[in-house]
Amino acid sequence: MMERTFSIIDFGACSTTDELQTRYIQAAIDECFLQGGGEVQIPEGTFLTGGIRLRSNVCLHLMENAHLKGIRDPEAYGVLEDDVIEPIPNNDRTVKLYHTPTADENFQTYEWFNRAGSRWNHGLIRAAYAKNVSVIGECGSALDGSDCYDALGEEFYRGPHLMNFFYCENITLRGYTCVDSANWAHAFFYSKNLIIEKVKIYAGHDGVHATRCDNITIRQCAFYTGDDCVAGFDNQNVIVQDCLMNTACSAMRLGATNALIEKCRFWGPGEYVFRGSLSLEEKRGGGKPQKIPSHRYNMLSVFTYYADFSTAIREQPGNIIIRHCNIENVDRLLHYNYSGNEIWQKNRPLQSVMFEDVYAMGISMPLTAYGDEKVPLYLTMRNVDIQFAPEDENMDFIHTCYYSMINLENVRIQGLSNGALVRSWGGQGRLIYKNLICDIPKENYFLTSDKSFVCQTI
């Protein structure tokens, strides 16, 4: 039986007009869904649109040089809340708007974040309670978020995501390019079985951000983002393979149980600006700002732990492995700061992380490995070659507290000589080193600090 195909042209869509094409695109998706599923084709051309809803068993196929361009009107993206074919439950709706999170908040105060039918969750392409959905792009296809400004959005300037999925299963995303997403390029919540492959992401904010999702595979993707490349927490079974990661924030801001990041290249500084450093006028105007000193491009870290209180965490985070990777010109290799001054790292602590077969150069800050008294950190570095470009010649290699084990095996450290190999603020576990090559004197391999722990938050 041949798969049903539907062209948006047959439903009235046109690429040679400034008229909004949302209703025509949505009509094609709805008809495909009502007939049992199939493929909706977006032909070559640029189609101006607001939010559209993807439904179960529907593949949105962007043909060669097909572009979906989001309108710069934040009121045009409420498709999920207005839908009559598959109305979302009342308890998944809210009028609560984004507010700046504080350290003492809990799950209940994140209603604007956790409910599919919120303004913050608006997106160019949205799906909720859907199964077997896909977005496939051919050569030259693109999704353009137009840096849509929203004064009611996150940080009072971010607009809709490019894609937003809630309670979905079996999602496949492949082959297209994302540009200028007004918030995250891909936002996933409470979903499972996600495959993102051969996708390119330029500028905007987070590339892929998943919250409470299971079985995520990201492979052969290219991230050139203003914010984190891959982010999220309370995720289980995450694989990131063969990806390029360039950002003005963290390559991985992740909390997960069982995560493998391998065969990736990380490098800074970012090609695109961290948009939070722009002026209000620049945020409103969109577009590509000039490079000036007040704009931030430096890449903050390779791996930053993430665990806030926007959702409960089901399983103990840990078994995170970063291996067979090359790293250049990044401020930090590891940023795990459970000391209490970082609101994004105050939910459940991290149990273990490993770097294996990693080459890094141009690192400018110590590794931070500050664990929890009840769940101390197990840090492994095996077959790691790391070259520092320190701002201070007395810089340490690792800053730590509450660890069960720091295991350094076949590790070569270059560029550090006067500081400590490991400087501890208490809660000592075991330090093991084998075949360690460095210029740090042995009497400085382990030092304790009598000063207050200070760590810049990111």
Give short role names for the model-derived ranges.
Residues 1-458:
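Extracellular/periplasmic carbohydrate-active domains that bind, remodel
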